[in-house]
Amino acid sequence: MKIYHLYRRQHLNLTIHEAWKFFSSPYNLNDITPEFFHVTIVSRMPKKIYAGLMISYRMKAVFGISMDWLSEISHCDEPKRFVYQQRIGPFNFWSHEVCLTEEQNGILLEDIIFYAMPIGWLGQFINSVLIASKLEQIFDNRHNYLQRKWGD
């Protein structure tokens, strides 16, 4: 199984507590993702995330195909970092770590993503012609939205 990696970092002009409030809420996903990637939260959400929290989504991603996704907050260190991992969904493996580090005049946001495609060589091919570029689009959109909202 081939493991893929995506890493992004960005300086934002807000406090670590403001950043935590924004990034730890799955209700903000549609604000920071492109229109083709619409997310509906299916499960009930508590006021704060915690390690072990399961979140059920329905999303439209590639070609508008609707799919279910179940993720777990596997690690939560408020207000510094959290990790969510796919438990049920389109990938063989998905882990997204969000790290927030206080800096002068704001925070450093780091996104660390590891993922693996299903169906062997065919999944690797689909990743190379479609999925990798879609993920780049999603995180480019996220970067641009955040830059407009809290950028330098």
Predicted regions and their residues:
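Generic structural detector for well-ordered beta-strands
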Residues: Y7-H11, T40, R58, E72, ...
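Short, surface-exposed coil-to-beta transition loops
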Residues: H5-Y7, S66-L70, N92-H96
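Beta-strand elements of well-folded, non-transmembrane domains
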Residues: L12-L14, M59-F63, H75, P90, ...
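Hydrophobic ligand-binding cavity/cleft-lining segments
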Residues: M1-Y50
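Glycine-rich portal/gate segments that line the openings of hydrophobic small-molecule binding cavities
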Residues: I41-I88, N141-D152
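Beta-strand/loop substructures that line and gate deep hydrophobic ligand-binding cavities in soluble
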Residues: Q86-Q137
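A short, structured loop/turn motif at beta-sheet edges
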Residues: I16, S74-R81, C99-L108
